[in-house]
Amino acid sequence: MKLQLLRNATLKLDYAGTTILIDPDFGSKHSRPSFTGRSPNPMVELPVSTDEILAGVELVIVSHLHADHFDKIAQELVPKHLPLVCQPGDEEKIRSFGFTDVTPLTERLTYEGIRLIRRDGNHGSGPVLEKMGNVIGLTIEADGEPSIYWAGDTILYPPVRETIATSAPDIIITHSCGAEWDDLLIVMDAEQTIEICRIAPEDTRIIATHMEALDHATVSRDDLQDYANAHDIAKHKLLIPSDGEVLHLSAPNA
């Protein structure tokens, strides 16, 4: 498989012969308001053009409708005929944008031999959870490919631990910028990401994303790497890609 981190949560995945676009946010640098007063968002430009991002895309996955996961520009530019998978409850809103092939991921579905399984997520805890709304993660599996657990916009909480324990994924993709809302954590921070490294199977690789793009983040790539080094996490265990970076990963024993 080939995975390209584009920016924040936006990923392009070549997997089992299908090109998948996950959580497209195409907004230009500083095109949206600040969350904290520190900087307009996004804080950086996309590393490649939207034409290049969309080239070859056959399936779109949208975890939830926050602007940094499916912004107005992406809603306009993503071809409306492409099959789009979303969380239950978002399908009618997405159809209102003109998309004609929208499927809510209630439990599991199969697309061209790729198995998608819905996983729970908590976009924060306590009073902030209602403000953030519902989100999903998912596992992605196909014969001959590494299994992926894409946790999505979630903190580390018992269902995430359970997913790791029961599915034993080859790859775990985390959102690790330590973003805060009302001084409460709404995605994983360095400590939680390193805990993921510890509880994951020995051969599982963790890919930390959703970093250095939004002004309510509290953890940079360097911060996370420093924390990993201080806790003796091997470099091959935790990957922290730059925007635009491409990773080539194989299934065990492939």
Walk through the language-model features, giving the residues of each.
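Pre-active-site segment of Zn-dependent metallo-hydrolases
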Residues: 18-61, 72-75, 126, 154-166
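Metallo-beta-lactamase
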Residues: 53, 86-145, 226-253
